Design a protein with these regions (language model features):
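Blade-level signature of beta-propeller repeat domains, shared across WD40, Kelch, NHL, RCC1
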Residues: 239-260
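Loop/turn residues immediately N-terminal
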Residues: 33-37, 69, 77-81, 123-126, ...
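Short loop/turn segments that connect beta-strands within beta-propeller blades
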Residues: 41-44, 84-88, 130-134, 188-191, ...
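N-terminal signal peptide c-region/cleavage motif recognized by signal peptidases
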Residues: 17-21
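Structural signature of eukaryotic scaffold interfaces centered on beta-propeller domains
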Residues: 60-68, 99-115, 151-169, 205-217, ...
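An edge-strand/N-cap motif at the start of beta-rich repeat modules
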Residues: 24-42
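A short beta-strand motif characteristic of beta-propeller blades
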Residues: 45-54, 89-99, 138-149, 193-201, ...
Length: 260
């Protein structure tokens, strides 16, 4: 069945949908009340929410670490935790060496080359974190490169690295600015420079985003927004909607991790 989606979805993503997307994935969604929900991108169905226990705080974001395959999260109390997404049991493995105040949404994503956790906030905070010790390196604040958007304050709400499988020879960090409806390449990541890649049209303030790499060197970018699942073209920012995810909880989704 072929279904078309329009602006009636509540946000103006450019979209034409297919019933069964190529490269189907299992996505792990994090709610704002610290629950995990598995999403099947092929069936567009959500599993039963699993409450996270033992995190010692509210989870700000999650990601799967390429180095060991485990799910990691960062809490609003500065804890770095590993999470069994089947049971919801979290274990504190480290504490951030410096306080992190995101000023809204947070980005939590692993750099697979360096095996370091990128932690960023809507207020421009840009941390590089050792996941085993919690040691923080404060990198350059988030800014747009000189040009049409130079001087504009980024409001980055989501971000993810490419090639997050094994220990790759290269990677790239993509971010989403919902105030401008913009997909960016953050390069260099440590300097926080946002390079515009394409307009994503009107987006809600909160979106969840991750990139799933495959063994052949491909990358598929997933977006969850207002209960709708889509695929993002990283070269242009265009979003192809796949449809509404059935069975999502009423709580806001703040992050997704695409599972290997």
């Amino acid at each position: 069945m072929h279904v078309s989606y329009s602006l009636a979805l509540g946000f103006g993503l450019a979209a034409a949908a297919a019933a069964t997307p190529a490269g189907a994935a299992t996505l792990l969604a994090l709610t704002n009340d610290s629950r995990l929900v598995e999403i099947d991108s092929e069936t567009l169905g959500a599993g039963r929410p699993v409450a996270i226990r033992g995190a010692e705080g509210r989870l700000l974001g999650i990601d799967q670490r390429a180095a060991d395959g485990r799910i990691y999260g960062v809490t609003d109390t500065g804890r770095i935790v590993t999470i069994d997404h089947r049971s919801g049991q979290a274990v504190v493995v480290a504490r951030l060496s410096e306080p992190f105040t995101p000023g809204g949404r947070s980005v939590v994503d692993f750099n697979p080359m360096a095996d370091r956790l990128r932690l960023m906030g809507m207020n421009g905070a840009n941390f590089r974190v050792h996941p085993d010790t919690g040691a923080v390196t404060r990198d350059g604040g988030l800014t747009y490169q000189p040009g049409p958007l130079g001087g504009t304050v980024p409001r980055i709400v989501a971000g993810a690295y490419t090639n997050s499988i094994g220990k790759p020879s290269s990677t790239a960090l993509y971010t989403i600015d919902t105030s401008l409806g913009q997909l960016n390449l953050q390069a260099p990541p440590n300097e926080g420079v946002q390079q515009a890649r394409g307009a994503m049209e009107s987006l809600p303030a909160g979106v969840a985003f991750d990139i799933l790499a495959d063994a052949q060197g491909g990358n598929r970018a997933w977006l969850l927004s207002a209960g709708q699942l889509g695929v993002v073209t990283l070269e242009t920012g265009q979003v192809r909607l796949l449809g509404a995810v059935a069975g999502l909880p009423g709580s806001e989704i703040v992050d997704i991790a695409a599972l290997h």
